Amino acid sequence: DPTQPAAPVVESDQAAEVASLDNALNNPDFTSVFAPIDPQASRKKMAKQAGVEPVILMEHVTKIYPAQPNKPALDDINIEIYPGEFVFLVGHSGSGKTTLLSTLNRDVKPTSGRILVAGQDLMKIKNRKVPFLRRQIGAVFQDFKLLPQKTAYENVAFALQCIGKPKGVIRSQVPEVLRLVGLADQMDSLPDQLSGGEQQRVAVARAMVNRPPLLICDEPTGNLDPAISLGIMKLLERINRTGTTVIVATHDREMVDSMHRRVIALEGGHVIRDQERGGYGNYGTN
């Protein structure tokens, strides 16, 4: 059950872990392995000029939970995100970040509005088609969501087994993606034998092994030390440079301010700011 509690986190040798992350980030094979979208379409302006359709289109999206009928979790959201963009989603807890991300893979169905993801209308898609939609979306979470009784290799392989990939493809792609995130020597380790940063790298590998064009991350560095958080974010940035669209919900002010990427700020279910090369803004960490 992928929703089981996260495995215990072992203490890490931070210097060694940072070094292994650096080695992964300097791997020249990233571009050859992860290239689902033309990197030239990596900026919103260029994509629009080229007539490229958004990979995510949200029009007048509202979500009202029955328990809070007078307080929409999302209220008239209008967003376009283009292939190859890297977007931060910021705001207080309860501002709507997680609900917004959950609508993108149909974990949550909006009350009203329209959502297109990779050209598919999520308000009209049949339930039996949802698993096919999710194959185009990688997901990374704060608590890793690794299967505790499976090794790093088995956790990543499981993502391919679930969509019926042949054994030969699994034997080829899983070691490759683990090598690319700097875990070639940890393939046989169980989650409780890995540090938090290593567990998150397994989660990133699992999310990317099917080479989806879209990666959504909900607080991916929330439980990690600053140095390891920086490495994970650089890993996501490296994946983004190959063309993958990356959306990251985070409370990490310093990270957002240092990376100068597009920032969408939510408050009370509303988009209150959508800024190219933006900063975190005046939001607390609660």
Sequence positions of predicted segments:
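Helix-to-loop junction immediately C-terminal to a conserved catalytic motif
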Residues: 105
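Conserved ABC transporter NBD signature motif
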Residues: 113-121
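Conserved ABC ATPase signature
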Residues: 190-194, 198-200
